Amino acid sequence: MNENNDITLTLRELWGKANPLWERRYEDFITTHTDYSVGTSKYLDSRGKVFGAGYEIYIVAFFLGLYANRRKPMTKDTSKKRKFGQPVGYWGQIEARGLRQPYPRIQDYIFAALFAKTNVDLIALDKGEIPAAQVISQMKQTMEEYANFGFSYMTEKLEENPDYFFKEGAFLKLFLPFLETAEECVEGPESLD
């Protein structure tokens, strides 16, 4: 394994220990659609929720921001921020229940997207001029800002229509406007004629 792979592996492992923040103003939205803050003894009370753990809706919020290519800075007030109980390295590693299967590869997809979208000076990192912890902090900030846009976008939809998320496929339909934009961008090269 060459030195660059060692750096990437180390970054991946360090990033797995990160626990991204989210703004408290989205807590009602998160608890409405997830089992977040619901103990296992209350599992039956949480029927009808689309997502299990709170981080699952965070993943959706992150990908909304990523697909829209929009970031929204977090509030600087730390009292208005929260984090989920599990670091990213545990996301998607739930046990299989019924039709539900673990999905740990999501971590790899998120990491790859963050690595591509975060302005990291790999040469400075390789030379030891910047610590890996600084790179992880930058990647975590990128993730938080994409997710913050995603949460903002979802709550806007909720304000427009309070029943929006109680319709089949509502969370998937959130991505459609951004997918159409992406398809327009890859139509092909401009003619040189």
Label each region the model flagged.
Residues 41-75:
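Short, basic amphipathic alpha-helical segments that act as recognition/interaction helices
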